[in-house]
């Protein structure tokens, strides 16, 4: 079920700075709700034409994802607010509670494992509600052409933070479709071939157990 959509700050111009921050904050909470999995990036003097080119490449490589420049301090607090609000029966955050004083007080007490990343000029790359190693691989391949402009700081994946090294390892995990295809291939193999595979696996297990036995 799709969660309710909040008013987006980008679609409304408000002169009052506090109201603008409030709209932006709500917009970020909604963005996190739509994509709780995202990469955290630091951008360095990225020119408008470079940003446009980067977005075009990412859109082609990872359809459905989005690169968005953020205001780090506001997004950071929005993430804490998102984590502090109890979910509705459909798994969504109650957007009516986002700007309540009680919610903000509760959010201030929350500690995140990526608290130290929200420094400097930042952007996020959304990965959607379901974590996809394939999407991360697509992003990493595009990132190679912007090494001096975009720095990968980490990832927020399934409510946990990971550093760039862990992101690299995560990107190497085979997709679910690949695993399903491999399993189907094995199951559809001739019985004799399947037996050889099982015998080989059994031999490997036996060898491993022998190696682990304490020497007399």
UniProtKB/Swiss-Prot annotation:
Subcellular location: Mitochondrion
Keywords, sorted A to Z: Mitochondrion, Ribonucleoprotein, Ribosomal protein, Transit peptide
GO cellular component: mitochondrial large ribosomal subunit; mitochondrion
GO molecular function: structural constituent of ribosome
Cross-referenced InterPro entries: Ribosomal_uL10-like_sf, Ribosomal_uL10_bac_type
Presequence positions on this chain: 1-9
Any single GO BP term: mitochondrial translation
Family membership noted in the UniProt record: Belongs to the universal ribosomal protein uL10 family.
Role played: Component of the mitochondrial ribosome (mitoribosome), a dedicated translation machinery responsible for the synthesis of mitochondrial genome-encoded proteins, including at least some of the essential transmembrane subunits of the mitochondrial respiratory chain. The mitoribosomes are attached to the mitochondrial inner membrane and translation products are cotranslationally integrated into the membrane.
Subunit and interaction comment: Component of the mitochondrial large ribosomal subunit (mt-LSU). Mature yeast 74S mitochondrial ribosomes consist of a small (37S) and a large (54S) subunit. The 37S small subunit contains a 15S ribosomal RNA (15S mt-rRNA) and at least 32 different proteins. The 54S large subunit contains a 21S rRNA (21S mt-rRNA) and at least 45 different proteins.
Name of the protein described by the UniProt record: Large ribosomal subunit protein uL10m
Organism lineage: Eukaryota, Fungi, Dikarya, Ascomycota, Taphrinomycotina
């Amino acid at each position: 079920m799709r969660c309710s959509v909040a008013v987006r700050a980008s679609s409304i111009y408000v002169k009052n700075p506090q109201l603008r921050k409030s709209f932006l904050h709500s917009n970020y909470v909604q963005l996190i709700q739509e994509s709780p999995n995202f990469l955290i990036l630091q951008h360095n003097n990225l020119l408008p034409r470079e940003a446009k080119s980067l977005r075009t490449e990412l859109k082609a490589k990872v359809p459905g994802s989005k690169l968005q420049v953020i205001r780090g301090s506001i997004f950071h607090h929005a993430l804490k607010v998102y984590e502090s609000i109890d979910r509705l029966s459909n798994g969504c955050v109650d957007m009516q509670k986002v700007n309540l004083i009680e919610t903000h007080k509760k959010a201030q007490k929350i500690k995140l494992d990526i608290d130290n990343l929200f420094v400097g000029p930042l952007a996020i790359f959304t990965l959607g509600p379901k974590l996809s190693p394939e999407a991360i691989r697509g992003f990493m391949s595009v990132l190679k052409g912007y090494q001096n402009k975009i720095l990968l700081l980490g990832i927020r994946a399934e409510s946990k933070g990971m550093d760039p090294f862990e992101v690299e390892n995560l990107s190497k995990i085979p997709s679910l479709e690949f695993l399903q295809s491999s399993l189907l291939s094995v199951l559809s193999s001739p019985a004799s071939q399947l037996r050889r595979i099982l015998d080989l696996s059994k031999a490997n297990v036996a060898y491993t157990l022998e190696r682990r036995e304490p020497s007399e």
